[in-house]
């Protein structure tokens, strides 16, 4: 049992007891991190003037050390052994004239720097004393938008109450660089970013691979006023946003889901109101331990940012067009609305098209193939599509000038440039023609018969097409930048649902 005597005499004066009673409450918990066989960054506590002794009395006392004690300031470090990896704990008892106080000591020991040496996000949360279901226990996971564990589906926030919002860095396991971080609000052209602080590079200690990384400049709080806001962090190659849409649009080669946000819970699992854990993914392996912040005094925006374009009851807000039949004429009942779904039988060639036009938007739609095929599609791949940015003055035809997100078995996400429209994909522009194909560069489809989600972002001439959370095609400098949208009927039975749009 380790013991350090801090005072050998006690003076029972009235002044002494007043000072002791009014002293700042002791910090009760100390959390350290270090690579195995090394010494952590120190932490300290100022003990009450009435302190008599401080001693380690339970747990893994060999992994913690009292570095020094001067003028009531006690400095502690974590010293894991060269063969220990994981979390260890001990307790330090501070004895004063008015009683005893127990200080809890927690240490996280890791294998080494970066890569497979890093702790899992679940381990990080455990070391920090947060009983959160992260959703996975391995190091790597994935960057798809499916919610994991206790993750919330919201990425924008309000300030919850008076005072400032706090954004406190509590963990970082990333490559070594300075990291600006902060919040953003909506503006006319793009997110308006407000830097709060900058995480430090490695110095005497590996600040990029530790708990409670140092801030090189700035602070850890801000006041957004009444604005709705999201969070961002900027690494050497890209900025990661709390909203997927900006990651898809600005940095489609990186993680689409760049943050996972969890309600903060204490060590017993009790919810800490208006507090959240913000976890960033810097690369694409899905570990989400790159930069981790505790957020305080915030509440999520829970209203849906999307507007439904299809009411599930009828085609109000749309009109239909069928080849050789015309507008709003459907003698063979090609379009059937039932169970909040648009069932396109597909016997006729045509579409349902919006009456309104849209610019700078994020569009979503679910589709599923049916069984039947007709005409030229009897022995071919099932085919359909979503066309967008159709000019208001463009007459109904097969097919109007637009950009098409191909929905065809095996090819979902291809660009088709219709009516001599053009776009550049990876720096190469299509040849203008009645219809030109620009193939997707990766695949995200589910097997025929399952529901798929297709997303389209059109923003100032840049078009991003996403299939089941995977960016499959990106085009720039499109010749058509705004307009109407349509859902095709192209000789294959298909079902559409959850048709909605968000103005950006």
Q: Which sequence ranges carry the predicted segments?
A:
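Bacterial Sec-dependent N-terminal signal peptides
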Residues: 1-23
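Propeptides and adjacent flexible N-terminal/non-core segments of secreted
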Residues: 76-79, 95-100, 108-268
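Short beta-strand-plus-loop segments that form exposed binding edges in beta-rich domains
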Residues: 233-236, 280-285
């Amino acid at each position: 049992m380790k013991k350090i005597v801090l005072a050998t005499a006690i003076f029972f004066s009235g002044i002494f007891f007043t000072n002791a009673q009014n002293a700042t409450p002791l910090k009760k918990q100390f959390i350290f991190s270090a690579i195995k066989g090394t010494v952590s960054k120190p932490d300290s506590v100022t003990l009450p003037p009435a302190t008599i002794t401080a001693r380690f009395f339970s747990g893994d006392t060999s992994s913690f050390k009292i570095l020094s004690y001067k003028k009531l300031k006690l400095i502690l470090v974590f010293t894991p052994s060269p063969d220990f990896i994981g979390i260890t704990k001990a307790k330090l008892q501070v004895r004063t004239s008015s009683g005893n106080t127990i200080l809890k000591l927690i240490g996280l020991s890791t294998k080494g720097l970066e890569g497979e040496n890093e702790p899992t996000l679940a381990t990080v949360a455990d070391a920090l004393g947060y009983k959160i279901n992260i959703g996975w226990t391995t190091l790597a996971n994935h960057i798809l938008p499916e919610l994991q564990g206790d993750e919330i589906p919201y990425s924008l926030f309000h300030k919850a109450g008076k005072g400032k919002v706090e954004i406190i860095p509590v963990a970082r396991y990333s490559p070594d660089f300075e990291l600006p971080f902060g919040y953003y609000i909506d503006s006319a052209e793009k997110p308006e970013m407000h830097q709060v602080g900058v995480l430090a590079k490695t110095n005497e200690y590996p600040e990029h691979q530790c708990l409670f990384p140092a801030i090189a400049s700035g602070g850890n709080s801000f006041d957004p006023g009444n604005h709705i806001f999201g969070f961002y962090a900027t690494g050497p190659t890209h900025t990661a946003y709390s909203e997927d849409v900006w990651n898809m649009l600005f940095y489609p080669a990186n993680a689409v889901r760049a943050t996972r946000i969890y309600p903060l819970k204490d060590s017993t699992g009790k919810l800490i109101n208006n507090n959240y854990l913000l976890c960033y993914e810097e690369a694409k392996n899905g570990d989400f331990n790159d930069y981790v912040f505790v957020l305080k005094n915030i509440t999520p925006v829970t209203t849906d940012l999307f507007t439904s374009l299809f009411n599930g009851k009828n085609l109000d807000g749309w009109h239909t067009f069928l080849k050789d039949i015309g507008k709003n004429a459907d003698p063979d009942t090609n379009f059937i609305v039932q169970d909040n779904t648009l069932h396109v039988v597909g016997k006729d060639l045509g579409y349902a098209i919006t009456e309104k036009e849209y610019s700078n938007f994020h569009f979503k739609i679910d589709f599923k193939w049916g069984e039947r095929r007709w005409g030229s599609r009897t022995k071919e791949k099932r085919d359909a599509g979503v066309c967008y940015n159709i000019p208001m003055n463009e007459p109904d035809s097969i097919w109007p000038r637009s950009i098409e997100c191909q929905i065809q078995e095996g090819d979902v996400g291809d660009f088709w440039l219709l009516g001599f429209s053009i776009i550049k994909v990876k720096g190469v522009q299509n040849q203008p023609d009645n219809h030109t194909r620009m193939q997707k560069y990766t695949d995200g489809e589910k097997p025929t018969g399952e529901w798929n989600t297709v997303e389209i972002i059109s923003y100032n001439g840049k078009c991003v097409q996403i299939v089941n959370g995977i960016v499959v095609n990106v085009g720039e400098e499109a010749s058509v930048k705004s307009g109407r949208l349509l859902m095709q009927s192209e000789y294959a039975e298909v079902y559409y649902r959850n048709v909605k749009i968000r103005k950006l």
